[in-house]
Amino acid sequence: MSGDAFHLTAPAENGHGAFRSMRNALRRARIEPEAIDYINAHGTSTPLGDEVELGAVKRLFGRHAYELSMSSTKSAIGHLLGAAGSVEAIFSILAIRDGIVPPTLNLDHPSLSCDIDLVPLRAKQRKVRYALSNSFGFGGTNASLVFTGPP
């Protein structure tokens, strides 16, 4: 978790809250960023929020950001507000169990900075050993969870 308390609804443009949340989750799980295969993005489809999250992912994961898959399931189910994090956690667990990462629907014209695998339009088969689920909430309360399957 992290709290940047930058603004009621907007993230800090430097993405430090998102970065710290993801970094802390990886540390608690005792894994390196390179272990993550899939990220269920907070991904609300807001230009600022999505760019900030994408920048934080690139900063934390470095080159590995271009090897993992990342999608926003809000594109399929909408923003469930208080329930969003739990439903997105379930999507992450299902990706591990089923070996299928969910798509980012309606991603017809991504910005130029969206140069990683955002799983556009269609689900994708992929072995997922570790998944990271991001939930970046109102007032700068950020949570990221790491999931893995049985050994």
Walk through the language-model features, giving the residues of each:
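Conserved "HGTGT" condensation-loop signature of ketosynthase/thiolase-family condensing enzymes
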Residues: 1-151
